[in-house]
């Protein structure tokens, strides 16, 4: 593969990263026909090609600060040397605004202590909710069972419920066939991956008849395993809902102005080219959705978290679920959804965040171009750093899994976020309730990570 420059990268419409979206140009000529549709780009190859062009450079590195005879011969630059970052010359200014922490409402500040943890949590959660500006998403959803089947030893219900807005939400509920009594439960949260045509089907299935694009996605990101099904086989009741803008909750091309959809039309759901074309369009359209939601007085993360809370409401309302033993888990934006939901809702007795841990500094300076608008509550970074959202659940059990070569974050900031969470739990006197691990490799939730995560969830949620 030839080297891709940054200019070429951003001109390549529809570039995908496993964790979210990349900035891309307009797609006015994209149509879902074999003659004009473009194949999905190799997102890992593109990201790796870009990485050497986006180094994290320390402005205090000796190479930039030491005087040398050669440097003395050079004319003084008109502007000070700026470390390369997303914001260019504005980067140092943005970094200074963020500061080195702790943020205003961080539990790590001296004014907060173990004895006042409940008061601190109440204040910090109130600020988070203010920034999220969550819309009214109704009460406990009234789910309809659309189809029920037994598959590979599991009893599976395909569900549907209607929120106060948008198309019906589809979800899959799984548990062991012939299970009796109340079961521990998992809210299984699917990823983003720039593939909005699909939702919960990226992590759960009810038959062997699977779309080839989903199969490829599961092979690449989950070791070939639909992990929601795996959790159900371990004795859990598992609910996997579609998130806002995904699967059943996606925006239909026929319902937006033609100037936005171009020549694209609703295609054949069995045609891979049509699905890829939609996903490319939807990645670009997410920018417009985020702006429109802000104009409506809400935020994309606020909508997503609110809908996940309604799914949790439904899960906890079921007679076959033990509400004292409910956990949640997800990779990438599923990890993001875990972070927000578990940080806000104490019904989550155990939370596993996979491949979605870093800091606001990392997003701001290094990696915002690789991520979705679902991450950013306006105004929050001065009050809470990103990992501290998950830290709001202290002292409840929390597991964070990271990949050492995750292309969506810098290792330095992943490690800094890990230390931040560990320090929060240590200050609260419950150091053992926080666990984390760094795995070799890139962004994924592979079989080794799944085994470790599921074993940990068993230790927190299984009957004693």
Question: Model regions: which residues?
Answer:
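Short beta-strand/loop motif that positions the catalytic acidic residue
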Residues: 400-402
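Alpha/beta-hydrolase fold nucleophile elbow
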Residues: 321-330
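Cap/lid segment of the alpha/beta-hydrolase catalytic domain
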Residues: 189-306, 363-365
């Amino acid at each position: 593969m030839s080297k891709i420059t940054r200019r070429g990268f951003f001109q390549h419409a529809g570039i995908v990263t496993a964790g979210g979206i990349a900035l891309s140009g307009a797609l006015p000529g994209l149509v879902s026909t074999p003659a004009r549709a473009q194949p999905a780009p190799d997102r890992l190859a593109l990201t790796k090609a870009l990485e050497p062009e986006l180094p994290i450079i320390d402005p205090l590195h000796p190479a930039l600060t030491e005087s040398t005879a050669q440097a003395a011969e050079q004319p003084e630059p008109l502007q000070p040397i700026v470390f390369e970052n997303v914001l260019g010359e504005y980067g140092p200014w943005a970094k200074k605004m963020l500061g080195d922490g702790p943020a205003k409402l961080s539990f790590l500040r001296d004014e907060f202590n173990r004895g006042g943890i409940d008061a601190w949590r109440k204040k910090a959660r109130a600020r988070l909710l203010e920034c999220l500006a969550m819309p009214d998403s109704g009460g406990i959803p009234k789910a309809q069972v659309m189809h029920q089947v037994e598959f590979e030893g599991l009893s599976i219900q395909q569900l549907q419920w209607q929120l106060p807005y948008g198309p019906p939400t589809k979800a899959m509920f799984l548990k062991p066939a012939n299970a009796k009594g109340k079961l521990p439960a998992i809210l299984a949260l699917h990823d983003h991956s720039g593939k909005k045509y699909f939702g919960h089907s990226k992590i759960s299935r009810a038959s062997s008849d699977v779309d080839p694009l989903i199969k490829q996605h599961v092979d690449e990101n989950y070791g070939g395993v639909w992990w929601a099904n795996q959790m159900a086989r371990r004795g859990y009741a598992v609910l996997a809902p579609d998130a806002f803008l995904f699967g059943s909750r996606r925006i239909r091309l026929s319902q937006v102005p033609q100037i936005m959809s171009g020549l694209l039309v609703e295609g054949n759901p069995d045609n891979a080219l049509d699905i890829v074309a939609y996903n490319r369009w939807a990645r670009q359209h997410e920018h417009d959705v985020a702006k429109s939601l802000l104009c409506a007085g809400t935020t994309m993360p606020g909508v997503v978290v609110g809908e996940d809370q309604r799914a949790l409401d439904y899960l906890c309302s079921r007679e076959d679920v033990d509400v004292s033993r409910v956990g949640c888990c997800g990779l990438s934006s599923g990890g993001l959804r875990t972070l927000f939901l578990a940080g806000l809702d104490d019904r989550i007795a155990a939370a596993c965040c996979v491949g979605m841990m870093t800091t606001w500094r990392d997003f701001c300076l290094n990696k915002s171009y690789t991520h979705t608008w679902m991450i950013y509550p306006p105004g929050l970074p001065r009050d809470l750093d990103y990992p501290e959202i998950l830290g709001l659940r202290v002292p409840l059990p929390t597991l964070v899994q990271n990949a050492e070569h995750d292309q969506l974050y810098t290792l330095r900031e992943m490690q800094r976020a890990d230390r931040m969470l560990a320090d929060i739990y240590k200050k609260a006197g419950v150091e053992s309730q926080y666990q984390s691990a760094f795995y070799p490799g890139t962004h994924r939730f592979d079989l080794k990570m799944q085994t470790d995560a599921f074993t940990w969830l068993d230790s927190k949620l299984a009957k004693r």
